[in-house]
Amino acid sequence: MPHQQILILFGLLPVATNISTWWNFGSMLLACSSMQVLTGFFLAVHYTANINLAFSSIMHITRDVPYGWMMQNLHAIGASMFFICIYTHIARGLYYGSYLNKKTWLSGTTLLIMLMATAFFGYVLPWGQMSFWAATVITNLLTAIPYLGTTMTTWLWGGFAINDPTLTRFFALHFILPFGIISLSSLHIMLLHEDGSSNPLGTNSDIDKIPFHPYHTYKDMLMLSLMILALLMTVAFFPDIFNDPENFSKANPLVTPQHIKPEWYFLFAYGILRSIPNKLGGALALVMSIMILLTAPFTHTSAIRSMTFRPIMQLMFWTLVATFAVITWAATKPVEPPFTTISQVASTMYFMFFITNPIMGWFENKIMKYN
């Protein structure tokens, strides 16, 4: 489609008439990204990247800085909202076959990896007890890499243990990565408008399109308003709902928490990591839990794009969603029976979705051919 940028500028971009609410999460992610950068800047102004002062500076922000408590809560809960939107966005892409826009899907998966890295670095910054130990456990996984692992870990830590240089590096990375995310988001949107958005039927949208503005802008604004309402209600009434009680204590390298775990949005990957009783195997499974998304465009074998008309794949998709929830829940529990077994079974089922997807596509093609 020629001159897409000019059409976007005047809000005249032709879009399929039948795209549903599931297509609104892209604009919601853009809003989340803007809010995170803005609140993050105001927090960075008052934050001190020093192991003796970091925890105190967070206390200072929430107690002494005007509306500092709001900035801190908006930033922390905004991150959770960001991940709710991105996981829904990915699920929609898997369900409706949006991954067949290869360049858009691959740039989006790269965005997810960058976002997860940024969120991880941000979780360490308050220098609470869980922040410190989560950083210790996750960064220590680098030592599982043959030959280079120990050197890479020492380089990342800035020494032989997590200390002041580690916090300084993590703050620098947490500050710089969002600019990379913004740049890549622009590329993601540009690539999307090169091919055009898919639709719930998985058909060619060219025959039935309407201008993006005002029709879809109003639809986007409705979902955006609901998201902001949910965010502000959580900030006002349940500000600590996603926080770990351990993180209200300053980091102490001499006391290990009973159960080390990251933020809720990493629990599915952490659950997959824990389910394998081998360091290198667990680290590989952790990486593969995200990287396997990159295989989706290349393993699609079905003649039908969307799962709207694929009942067997619908069953498998909702099994994947349930599996994701089960792994997240199991990862909050101690490493003991029956939780280890549940994690192992759920992790296997998670990967089985991506393995059986091309087989089911081939099977569906055979059924349609014989009918």
Swiss-Prot record:
InterPro entries: Cyt_b/b6_C, Cyt_b/b6_C_sf, Cyt_b/b6_N, Cytb/b6-like_sf, Cytochrome_b, Cytochrome_b_C_euk/bac, Cytochrome_b_N_euk/bac, Di-haem_cyt_TM. SUPFAM superfamilies: a domain/subunit of cytochrome bc1 complex (Ubiquinol-cytochrome c reductase), Transmembrane di-heme cytochromes. CDD domains: cytochrome_b_C, Cytochrome_b_N. The chain crosses the membrane at residues 25-45, 69-90, 105-125, 170-190, 218-238, 280-300, 312-332, 339-358. It is found in: Mitochondrion inner membrane. Its main location: mitochondrion. Heme b b562 binds at residues 75, 174. Heme b b566 binds at residues 89, 188. It is a multi-pass membrane protein. One of its GO terms (molecular function) is metal ion binding. This is Cytochrome b. The lineage of its organism: Eukaryota, Metazoa, Chordata, Craniata, Vertebrata.
